[in-house]
């Protein structure tokens, strides 16, 4: 069984199952699994704060707990929520296109797991989500 990172201890059960799936079934490295967790934790912190703006300031974005996220809340995620999240990442967190693209990939994989692999969700709300364009640099 894949070793669970202490980073993941404050996640909700569905996310814990997904991270276990990535490590044991998909064979992802512990570091890769941790990166998925960090990407998804940031999204669900944003998701909660977007529903309750007071959370952005009190106790602070980095302190928002996600251990109480439910399947119903996950099912309520819309493509518009994710577009707003991408804007938040670019404007407030100063994430470049490559970082945002990785977060899109994490979200896609998570929602595919919930719809295709487990059948917990009937519809994938981010199926039409596009990956941010990454500028190609010229060779040096």
Where are these predicted regions, by residue range?
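N-terminal core-binding DNA-recognition domain of tyrosine recombinases/integrases
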Residues: 2-5, 16-31, 40-138
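A detector for short, charged/polar N-terminal pre-domain segments
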Residues: 6-10
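Gly/serine-rich nucleotide phosphate-binding loop at the start of the catalytic core
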Residues: 13
């Amino acid at each position: 069984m894949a070793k669970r990172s202490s980073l993941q201890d404050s996640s909700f059960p569905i996310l814990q199952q997904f991270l276990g799936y990535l490590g044991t079934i998909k064979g992802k490295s512990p570091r890769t699994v941790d990166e998925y967790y960090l990407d998804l934790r940031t999204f669900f912190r944003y998701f909660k704060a977007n529903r309750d703006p007071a959370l952005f300031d009190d106790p602070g974005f980095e302190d928002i707990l996600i251990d109480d996220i439910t399947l119903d809340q996950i099912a309520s995620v819309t493509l518009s929520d994710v577009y707003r999240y991408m804007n938040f990442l670019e404007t407030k967190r100063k994430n470049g296109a490559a970082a945002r693209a990785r977060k899109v990939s994490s979200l896609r994989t998570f929602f595919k797991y919930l719809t295709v692999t487990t059948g917990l969700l009937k519809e994938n709300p981010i199926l039409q989500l596009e990956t941010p364009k990454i500028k190609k640099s010229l060779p040096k």
